[in-house]
Design a protein with these regions (language model features):
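Metal-associated gating/positioning segment near the N- to mid-region
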Residues: 59-136, 215, 247
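Active-site core of metal-dependent hydrolases
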Residues: 199-309, 318, 323-330, 350, ...
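Divalent metal-dependent hydrolysis catalytic cores, especially in the metallo-beta-lactamase
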Residues: 94-95, 105-130, 144-153, 187-201, ...
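His/Asp/Glu-enriched, well-ordered alpha-helical/loop segment
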Residues: 226, 295, 306-389, 431
Length: 431
């Protein structure tokens, strides 16, 4: 069982507590009892009964929170695209294949944790795998992050991920009924696929074409809200963002070119954006001989990339919250590279490393509805922490190799991850 029943104190460290400016604090000890941070004290005043763990001057910060995860895929690029519908049909064929599928997703969740991500928010998965893994992780039966689970999403015929990671709704009534069906599995949120994406577009200039009509969006959102769940939506066009915000969506996943009206709607709805620069970058910036993208996919990738960045900048300037997620599972987007999304946020949106770290920890926790539980290093919060040798405020690549991951007090020293060398090599060209 992956539980901690000991008392220990992390000492001789530089503390970055998750607050917006991430001011480094020295001379402190983080005291952990069981799953929680019991107190933060001066290092010379560690309470009796706590084992002192000397970190040798290393950096301690909150565990990262990845707000946009698809557990069933590794991110390994393929020269030839496979049919996701056939793959999902194969993996859900019988009890044995389902067990294999859940086990595979458990492995990917473990990789997220070993990379320093102590909470994931899933936004489209196979069957009820997400909630199964959430419950196993919460019970300490598997080594995995905290999971905020969506299970299957709701799409429309011909829509994004329709028939694979999303059900198909043919009407507003069916959209609401599908939300009820998903809700029976006790997920934490509902995911809608409102527009197409880069791979769905058939001609240049049409990424994110509107697939789900406004009345379906409203019916699904209203039903989700009536059941106490927020609604996240895949959106990659200005029209799609407006339809989403006008009809009850709470979080815009990805984004598109902003307008004044759009930003006003974000504020009125108290909605937020989850910026996902990572999946657009390979399509937009890689040579096509490497990405294996068609000309249309590359050009549309550039449109989506520019739209996500532009909306994030506009939202930041207007005070609209912008959280971070990787869209892991897309080609070249692995379960161990959340740190790259922070780096891209700095590079393309102009924020500081401190603000990127805050966004991926305390802010993401608040947007996910778990700000009272995790996201910062404070007394009575969950002991979800990471430790690195180098200063992430100077270079976020310090998060690439960690010395320790702590999830709910359970300590993992020197976490090891098998990485994809070719993927690392290509992505490193764009640091």
């Amino acid at each position: 069982m992956y539980h901690n029943d000991k008392k220990y104190a992390l000492t001789n460290c530089v503390l970055l507590d998750g607050s917006e400016h991430m001011e480094p604090q020295t001379g402190k000890a983080v005291c952990i009892a069981g799953e929680t941070i019991s107190e933060i004290v001066d290092a010379q005043h560690i309470p009796a009964g706590y084992e002192a763990v000397d970190l040798g001057g290393k950096y301690v910060l909150p565990g990262l929170i990845n707000m946009h995860v698809h557990l069933p895929a590794s991110g390994r690029p393929k020269k030839k695209a496979s049919d996701p519908k056939k793959l999902v049909k194969l993996i859900t064929f019988c009890a044995l294949t389902n067990r294999i599928g859940v086990s595979m997703c458990e492995g990917y969740a473990k990789t997220e944790l070993l990379s320093g991500v102590t909470t994931i928010r899933t936004v489209g998965g196979v069957a009820d795998y997400d909630t199964k893994i959430r419950d196993l992780a919460a019970a300490g039966k598997i080594l995995a992050p905290r999971v905020l689970a969506s299970n299957m999403a709701v799409s429309v015929p011909g829509g994004h991920m329709a028939g694979s990671l999303a059900y198909e709704a043919h009407s507003a009534e069916e959209a609401a009924a599908l939300v009820e069906k998903i809700a029976a599995e006790k997920p934490d949120l509902i995911k809608l696929m409102i527009t197409g994406g880069v791979l769905d577009a058939e001609v240049v200039g049409e990424p994110g074409v509107l697939r789900m009509q406004p009345e379906l969006v409203k019916a699904a959102s209203d039903k989700a809200h009536s059941l106490g769940m927020i609604v996240a939506a895949h959106v990659e066009s200005p029209e799609g963002v407006m339809v989403a915000l006008q009809n009850g969506v709470d979080s815009i996943e990805h984004g598109a070119q902003p307008s004044d009206e759009m930003i006003t709607l974000f504020k009125q709805r108290k909605a937020f954006q989850i910026s996902t620069i990572s999946p657009a970058l390979p399509y937009a910036l890689f040579d096509r001989s490497i990405s294996h993208a068609t000309y249309e996919q590359q050009e549309n990738g550039k449109i989506v990339f520019d739209g996500i960045v532009a909306l994030a900048k506009a939202n930041l300037a207007a005070g609209v919250p912008v959280g971070l997620g990787t869209d892991v599972g897309c080609p070249y987007i692995t379960h161990y590279d959340m740190w790259r999304e922070l780096h891209y946020f700095v590079k393309y949106c102009g924020v500081t490393p401190a603000f990127a770290l805050y966004s991926a920890t305390k802010l993401n926790a608040r947007l996910a509805g778990i700000g009272d539980l995790t996201g910062s290093i404070e007394a009575d919060k969950q002991a979800d922490l990471i430790v690195c040798t180098n200063d992430p405020l100077r270079n976020l690549s310090a998060l690439r190799e960690l010395d320790m991951v702590v999830k709910g007090g359970y300590r993992i020293d020197k976490p090891q991850i098998k990485k994809m060398d070719g993927v690392e090599r290509e992505l490193d060209k764009f640091l």
